[in-house]
Amino acid sequence: KNGYQISISPTLSYRLIYQTPEVGLFNKCDFWMRSDSVIVINIRGTIGKTESWLENFYSAMIPATGKLQLNDSTLFNYKLAERSNAYVHVGWTIGMAHLVPFIVKQLNELYKTGHKEVIIFGHSQGGAIAYLTRSYLEYLPETQLPKDIVFKTYCSAAPKPGNLYYAYEFDFVTRGGWAFRVVNSADWVPETPLTVQTLDDMNEVNPVVDYKSSTQSMPWLVRMYVNSAYKKMDKTANKGVKYYQKYLGNTVFKQVQKTL
């Protein structure tokens, strides 16, 4: 009508080929095969279960490389970044840790039939787990996953899965347009979890970190004022970290532990 197309028919179709069981804190993902043979991993977001929301609130930070004791019998080794100062959200790392054994197994099976192009997608909580899953797959040795699989990642309305140094690492791994984060600027989810920045989080070359040296040439009165102000701000930030660890770390951990 008037030269415009009334409806658009999809040029590609998708077929569900595998679903993981619900694991961890009600985490789940699907494997779809696109009509052009590209594999799409769709990671589910938060659902209306207390355990699923606990995963979001369990937002203490852990090193991006380490071990997680998932339960009495399962120790999960993971590497999500090269940087020692990269940290990630513990709740979503737990979700990722429960899903990736199924994901890796399916990818290896699909690889045997020639499928080497994979899209990783997740919305909301699923978007955060999609970030971490992509990072995990990047650092798996070739004995566990072939290195010529091509991944592209789409994170829709995803919250922040790690700190700034994890973000730097993820950006480098997916450089060249191999990852996209799609957000609505008015959405509150990408603003979470709450973050607290201290002097310890900054690069050593930042003059703010070594503010005492930076103020040596200032007049005595100015130097005393700056030192006093910095100490108060740093003390407030560190106090915020302690509350964060207490309520969004230790307290939530007790509830998560009961579930797992």
Annotated model-derived regions:
Residues 1-7:
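Charged, compositionally biased non-catalytic regions
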Residues 12, 17-118, 143-145, 150, ...:
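A conserved cap/lid and substrate-binding interface adjacent to the catalytic center
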Residues 23-24, 129, 162, 174:
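Short, glycine/acidic-rich beta->alpha junctions
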Residues 42-46, 123-124, 156-158, 184-185:
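Active-site-proximal beta-strand/loop segments in catalytic clefts of secreted hydrolases
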Residues 52, 130, 165:
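Short glycine-/acidic-enriched loop or helix-start segments at secondary-structure transitions
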Residues 101-117, 139-260:
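Serine hydrolase/lipase
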Residues 122-126, 130:
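Gly/Ala-rich beta-loop-alpha elbow adjacent to hydrolase catalytic centers
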Residues 132-136:
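Active-site signature of alpha/beta-hydrolase-fold catalytic machinery across serine-
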